[in-house]
């Protein structure tokens, strides 16, 4: 596992965006051989999306031959609802880049048969071979995507019941009213994430410190699903200073020394 200990959330976004651009450009994608990118929603990736849009407008990267798969979507929330993940992705990213509409993949939380929808999503991912890079965030309780504590580390895309803690945390997007936050969501599984060639998790804020500590210094544990990344051959944690507050000083120092070159010129 790589840990990139940066200073601010803006630094995290810039580093993540630069890494994605480097990966896409090195891959040299084409219509016949697209780059497959997994994407999250929420507060953590906002700075990364801003930086990606800026780099695209500067001519540093094209998304014309990039296919995206999003991590999750609420069940029962209309696609055009201001807090749907469809709306989030288009407003914050897709509307500002040259990605082809047919290359955007988001789970349908209004599907009549959610089990069939999850199966379709898994099959479509497999039709491309694999996701080359999956960017994600992490919840206060260590969940990735909507794989809440005690999720199977072998799980695939499925419907999940959201914990009260997650709904309370997400109520800030619904005017602070927990009752407006959907109780269910469709989400890629832990196993789906682990199948990706590379997984990059963005960790920002003091409220994520316990999750980061569990991921880096703890044992692999289904109560902290983020810890599954210890099993991945190419996992990266990109974090700001507040999120490292629960890590041992020597842990942060160790990774800072290892990643000195990669953290330059942000």
UniProtKB/Swiss-Prot annotation:
* Activity regulation, free text: Allosterically activated by N-acetylglucosamine 6-phosphate (GlcNAc6P).
- What does the UniProt keyword field contain? Allosteric enzyme, Carbohydrate metabolism, Hydrolase
Q: What positions constitute the catalytic site?
A: 72 (proton acceptor), 141 (for ring-opening step), 143 (proton acceptor), 148 (for ring-opening step)
**Which Gene Ontology terms describe the biological processes this protein takes part in?**
carbohydrate metabolic process; glucosamine catabolic process; N-acetylglucosamine catabolic process; N-acetylneuraminate catabolic process
Q: Which InterPro entries does the protein's record reference? A: Glc/Gal-6P_isomerase, Glucosamine6P_isomerase, Glucosamine6P_isomerase_CS, NagB/RpiA_transferase-like
Per the UniProt record, the site (Part of the allosteric site) maps to: 151, 158, 160-161, 254
Disulfide bond positions: none
Q: Which GO terms describe its molecular function?
A: glucosamine-6-phosphate deaminase activity; identical protein binding
| Class in the EC hierarchy, top level | hydrolase
Q: Which domain of life is it from?
A: Bacteria
Task: State which Enzyme Commission number(s) the record gives.
Answer: 3.5.99.6
Which Gene3D superfamilies does the entry link to?
3.40.50.1360
Xref: Pfam families: Glucosamine_iso
* Reactions it catalyzes: alpha-D-glucosamine 6-phosphate + H2O = beta-D-fructose 6-phosphate + NH4(+)
Under PROSITE patterns, the record lists: GLC_GALNAC_ISOMERASE
Its pathway, per UniProt, is: Amino-sugar metabolism; N-acetylneuraminate degradation; D-fructose 6-phosphate from N-acetylneuraminate: step 5/5
One cellular component term (GO) for this entry is:
cytoplasm
Q: Which NCBIfam families match?
A: nagB (TIGR00502), PRK00443.1-5 (NF001685)
Q: What does this protein do?
A: Catalyzes the reversible isomerization-deamination of glucosamine 6-phosphate (GlcN6P) to form fructose 6-phosphate (Fru6P) and ammonium ion.
Assembly, in brief, is: Homohexamer.
The Swiss-Prot or TrEMBL record describes its family as follows: Belongs to the glucosamine/galactosamine-6-phosphate isomerase family. NagB subfamily.
**What name is this protein filed under?**
Glucosamine-6-phosphate deaminase
Record organism: Pectobacterium atrosepticum (strain SCRI 1043 / ATCC BAA-672) (Erwinia carotovora subsp. atroseptica)
């Amino acid at each position: 596992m790589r840990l990139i200990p940066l200073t601010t959330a803006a630094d995290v976004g810039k580093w993540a965006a630069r890494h994605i651009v480097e990966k896409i450009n090195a891959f040299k994608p084409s219509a016949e051989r697209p780059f497959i990118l997994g994407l999250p929603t929420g507060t953590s990736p906002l700075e990364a999306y801003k930086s990606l849009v800026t780099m695209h407008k500067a001519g540093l990267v094209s998304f014309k031959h990039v296919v995206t798969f999003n991590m999750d979507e609420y069940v029962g929330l209309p696609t055009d609802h201001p807090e749907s993940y469809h709306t989030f992705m288009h407003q914050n990213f897709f509307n500002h880049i040259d990605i082809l509409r047919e290359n955007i993949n988001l789970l349908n939380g209004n599907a009549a048969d959610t089990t069939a929808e999850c199966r379709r999503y898994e099959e479509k991912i497999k039709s491309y071979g694999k996701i080359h890079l999956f960017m994600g965030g992490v919840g206060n309780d260590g969940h990735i995507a909507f794989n809440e504590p005690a999720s199977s580390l072998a799980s695939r895309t499925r419907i999940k019941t959201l914990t009260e803690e997650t709904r309370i945390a997400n109520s800030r997007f619904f005017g602070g009213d927990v009752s407006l936050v959907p109780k269910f969501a469709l989400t890629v599984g832990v196993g789906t994430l682990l199948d990706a060639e590379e997984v990059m998790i963005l960790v920002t804020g003091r409220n994520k410190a316990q999750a980061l500590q569990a991921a880096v210094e703890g044992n692999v544990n289904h109560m902290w699903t983020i810890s599954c990344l210890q099993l991945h051959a190419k996992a990266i944690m990109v974090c700001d200073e507040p999120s490292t507050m629960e890590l041992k000083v020597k842990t942060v120092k160790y990774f800072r020394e290892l990643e000195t070159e990669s953290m330059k010129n942000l």
